[in-house]
Amino acid sequence: MCIGPAPTPETEEELPPSPQHVLTEKDHQRLRFQRNIGVSAHIDSGKTTLTERILYYTGRISQIHEVRGRDAVGAKMDSMDLEREKGITIQSAATFCDWETTDVATGNKQNYAINIIDTPGHVDFTIEVERALRVLDGAILVLCAVAGVQSQTTTVDRQMRRYGVPRISFINKMDRPGANPWRIVNQIRSKLRIPAAAVQVPIGIEDEFKGVVDLVHWRSIYNEGQKGNEVVISQEIPESVMELAKAKRNELVEQLAEVDEEIGELFLNDELPNNDQIAAAIRRSTIALKFSPVFLGSAIKNTAVQPMLDGVCAYLPNPAESEVLAHDTSLPSSAPQVQLTPAADAPLVGLAFKLEEGRFGQLTYMRVYQGTLKKGNQIYNARTGKKVKVPRLVRMHSNEMEDIESIGPGEICAIFGVECSSGDTFTDGSTSFSMTNMYVPEPVISLSIKPKGIETPNFSRALNRFQKEDPTFKVHIDHESKETIISGMGELHLEIYVERMRREYNTDCVTGKPRVAFRETITQRADFAYTHKKQTGGAGQYAKVVGYIEPMEPDPETGKDVAFESVVMGGNIPTNFIPAIEKGFYEALEKGALSGNAIFGCRFVLKDGAFHAVDSSELAFRLATIGAFREAFKMAKGVILEPIMNVEVVAPVEFQSQVIGGLNTRRGTIVDSEVRDDEFTAAAEVALNDMFGYSNQLRGSTQGKGEFSMEYKHHMPVLPNLQKDLEEAYRRTLVVKK
């Protein structure tokens, strides 16, 4: 699905065939003061702490609790015991709150309803971030004032672009020694390649950080009171920052002039825009994904969080301003997508974006895009065609809930008692719309798992539930070793599930050594003409398939890189056998001939064939296809691929040579390095196969002061010597089996 600006149709005829439901004045009134936002960042940028402050200042919680459970309570948004203990957010919790803003010009107060989704910052939980961004209209990108743009920040940035999510940036931890917001603003421009400018200037820095100067409305904002509850606004700008504030306001106008026509014209005519014109330009260019306003603050010191909340209301879009497209499944797949309208009286369209096993059965988080969802309604699952009743409708606050009777378009809610999978679309049955499925990355690591002692029903129950909740967590049985294999996005990802099994299902497990998910692919086109014949008395088997296989690039939208095409003309192969041929192709992809790993990046084109009136069957064509594929694969110059990871290491400067040396010994390619006052960051691309045991080595070589994060980048062909070793090892296993 594409959430974000779609290309503007040139003419009336090109408009997508959309049932044009017009938004009424009542719809506009309701939507104008509504925001669906996410909080995304690199791990440890202070994302959960910031969300905790937002909930406190909006009156949603009465006390502030810190992350890592220092006060034995833990942050509100981290509702799993495991999250509180490790101090990381694993699941995105969805929360609803209210925020009152004051119009600077008129002094009028206005109440906004905000849905916040707190997303995990750890790369192993990327799917949670993808799901959250998919249902948002805007996001807050949190950056650390010292570390700045880190590896996961660029991942989140890429995901925001994929789903077209406008963002405001918040530079947190302004109280930390070494905080330098201007370096971070430059990093946002250079590393994330989005025009950005600060809309605030700090009053004092590091432990002197007291407040901010609002560059748009030209005033000073301070926080007072023990928890920063009181916001004190002064029209006086402190003398110490006056020059800097003037320079940064000019910089803001210059940046806006490049992305906004109105400001650009004023700029060319040497006219200065007024405060309202600047604010309107920031809103326009942020929603158009051309600009990101940068706010500064310190969540842990309760400073400048409220002005950032005002920024959410002022600059991020409401549900009527973000474009949502759906597929009409009654039309051919090449038909243009249909635009949905957040009108309350339009036919219902909603997306289940997250599942949880609650105390009262399955809890399904849903965003309603169009129409109204009422308790007791009958709704249809677009994927399965099943009709279900909504027995209970709730609004979530992390893991507490309030019952509601109905929910309108543009809102996020949770429903009980509805069986479905993550990414399912629900309608009222009058339309055939489907929000296309989310982009799900392939797993890169797997390990065998078995329960200690006797296997209980809880073991399979847990695995089933985790697979339903998380599409990147896969389970299969290895046919040869009969072991249960779990696969995921990283060691921590799998570790968390093994740990959840112990806590939530009382099942202790033994795990095997982690294994890398190698793949196979082809590098050139190969033709095939294969006949499968078997005569065993009675009806035999006969099928002939002719065509070719060729390399295929992944689809940028869906990530799909295997495809089956049939261009058979005439009746050489009856159409009822084509699905069997397709099935045979997908079966052949499961195990490559080189190393026994799955095959990717391949298109199978069926051109011709032959059949026998008596001896041809679905089985015969399936077996013919498998045989044809294996024969063609030998001529298509197959190679083994391995996952390459983006690795980012942060360590004190004195260990720079040891860290670089350690990455070089693991065949890493250093792609970037940056030295700050007393620490440095190295970014490298390293094969996952060479990364085992790296955390211990890094701890040893940096006296425990270094830390690293890694994230899957892509698969690349292995070195010839490794390919030879893998092929030999696979051949040996085949000999043993014989």
Curated annotation (Swiss-Prot):
Start and end residues of each stretch annotated as Disordered: 1-20
Gene Ontology CC terms: mitochondrion
PROSITE patterns xrefs: G_TR_1 (PS00301), G_TR_2 (PS51722)
Biochemical pathway: Protein biosynthesis; polypeptide chain elongation
Record key words, sorted: Elongation factor, GTP-binding, Mitochondrion, Nucleotide-binding, Protein biosynthesis
GO annotation terms (biological process): mitochondrial translational elongation
Main location class: mitochondrion
tr-type G domain residues: 32-320
Tagged with keyword NAD: no
Binding site for GTP: 41-48, 118-122, 172-175
Location in the cell: Mitochondrion
Source species, domain of life: Eukaryota
PANTHER family hit by this protein: ELONGATION FACTOR G, MITOCHONDRIAL
Record family assignment: Belongs to the TRAFAC class translation factor GTPase superfamily. Classic translation factor GTPase family. EF-G/EF-2 subfamily.
Note: This protein may be expected to contain an N-terminal transit peptide but none has been predicted.
Protein name: Elongation factor G, mitochondrial
